[in-house]
Amino acid sequence: MRYAVCANGAIVAEVAGGRTLREVSIEKDLVLDLYRRVRDLPITFDIFADSTVYTERARFSLIDELDLSDATKDFVRSVRTVYDGSFEDQLARVGNVCRLNVFYRRPEDRDAVCVLIDDVPTLRHTSSLPCNIEVTDSSAHKGAGLRWLCDYLGVSPADCIAFGDGDNDRTMLEAAGDGVAMANACAATLEVADHVTASCDESGVGLYLAPIFSAIASAR
């Protein structure tokens, strides 16, 4: 893999060289204001910055209570760095914030957070799990990241195939010439897909690409 669109399109990276080619950050004043509005809710408020996911120690145990498989919860814990002290101090220590993540248990907490985000024109939210909210700058999403990378490489998005199953994949499927939803995709992603392949557990990406690669090889 040479390039990666990360953090819901907020970062485009050259993997081999370890270079960040593009980063769209959230203003720290907005991050702090949003945190202060939601801090009394039983949620996490994770900061994505400096290639690290920072989670407040007092909120880390909420992951245990999420309606997720044990394997998914183990993964979520493994990619987080717990910090002590105040959120304000931690925010001041880190570099650019490219994304925020909120885990919640109750629908009313989700709704309360989303209403606040919707009130800020420069923010957007999406999700990849049934219990999370992913927040980026309004211009940062996977579709925008794909289009930027295509422009950087001199490739037309019309010649790209994109696969996805979450709501956060929807803009990417719309941007690509062939947007392919996994069979296990959420309804919003299935709705915008050009095609549907087998589920993630059934190796849907490989099944879809195999005949395409075979046809390319035969044409040479």
Predicted regions and their residues:
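Mg2+-dependent phosphoryl-transfer enzymes with acidic/Ser/Thr/Gly-rich catalytic loops
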Residues: 118, 133-220
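Short, hinge-like loop/turn segments at secondary-structure boundaries
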Residues: 1-2, 21-24, 62-66, 143-144, ...
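Short hydrophobic/aromatic-enriched beta-strand-loop microsegments
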Residues: 1-7, 125-126, 179-183, 197-198
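Conserved acidic, metal-coordinating active-site core of Asp-based
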Residues: 37, 41-44, 48-163, 167
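Alpha-helical substrate-recognition element adjacent to the catalytic core
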Residues: 1-31
